[in-house]
Amino acid sequence: MSVHAVVLIQCEIDEISEAAEAITDIEGVSEVYSVAGEFDLVAIVRVAEHDDLAKVIPGGIAKVDGVARTETLIAFQVYSKHDLERLFSIGFEQ
């Protein structure tokens, strides 16, 4: 089983790019998006266990230079078009 979380990140305005690059290097972070709105970055976190979130988010992302604030959304269920395509293609490869 794995745990997925979406981390909304506010950064110091002049450190967004550097923070994004540093966050992508943290184990457990699979993707980082630069976004418009209240938050500057969105990180997708995928870890093996719930306890691992503490290592990645407050122990990693929140400590990155330029990160001012984070808000974490823990996923109950993951829906992905890519996962569904893989599921339904089993046995139909040519």
Identify the meaning behind each predicted range:
Residues 1-94:
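A compositional/biophysical signature of low hydrophobicity enriched in polar/charged and small residues
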